[in-house]
């Protein structure tokens, strides 16, 4: 008799994706982050569902309802902080996952990579709308500043902003629709992640060498299931330490003040995971230019495949490219730091230089050493 996991229509799909899936024998811990992102997504949906049971998307009661969750709901505080810090873990895993894809040339899987970029945009949109929901000072002013950027679009900009707001300013209508979108988007992300996985399994996983591993595959279970569980335990440990010991470490104190349209905070800034993009946006004095640079900073990932000039897929054996990759990482960390600083000297010029360097490394400097490395192969 055939095993049920190989014959049952539904079990067969799960079996081919997570159990009998042929996987390269040499994939390192950098390949753990896909499964960690799946765990983060499940955690966010579950905690978000319980938060939605008690939250009210009305400007007069939103802030109070979040306070009520933390004070009066059984274990409401841990659900709230798991959700808030879970988003930070989500983005840490996401950035490492994208970085690994850039380092090892995973962008050569065109469909998988492009859907990944769409996923990145969707997750960023979801996180932004989630940040607005507690209706604190930073929620309100963050929403006002970021939605206002759309007014830079020629001709239709102002109408578009008022359409998104549902009025002439960020108000009840904005909060209600942001809550609706914040609720539905994680399910769209789940669907996109399934398609992402579907395309990945069409080609099979990449590996650190960047060389085809078809002749040396091992079953996903038990080898990589155990490895993924270990990674998940590490991630949960870090998340729980953050939630139980320092839940507000990554938040903004301004968000503990109810939203007040008449009082602007001294420094308006988004959550830490958007600071690099925010720094790029601020570094250009022109509004439309800033918006275009902001979008380009993420959309540039789609060009990675076209900018690949090396004969080798992975950076594993390309020291010059490795140096540039780590320069890019350092530059993004610098941008994150700048995004959290006030708009004054010397931060303005540092931000502008770091923004130029960011695009310069990806568009110009990275393709160049690849050509040198190709010539070195002939020696």
UniProtKB/Swiss-Prot annotation:
Binds 2 heme b groups non-covalently. It is a multi-pass membrane protein. It holds the Pfam family Cytochrom_B_C. GO terms for molecular function: metal ion binding; ubiquinol-cytochrome-c reductase activity. PROSITE patterns: CYTB_CTER, CYTB_NTER. Keywords: Electron transport, Heme, Iron, Membrane, Metal-binding, Mitochondrion, Mitochondrion inner membrane, Respiratory chain, Transmembrane, Transmembrane helix, Transport, Ubiquinone. The gene is MT-CYB. Its cofactor is heme b. It comes from Sus cebifrons. A ubiquinone binds at residue 201. This is Cytochrome b. Heme b b566 binds at residues 97, 196.
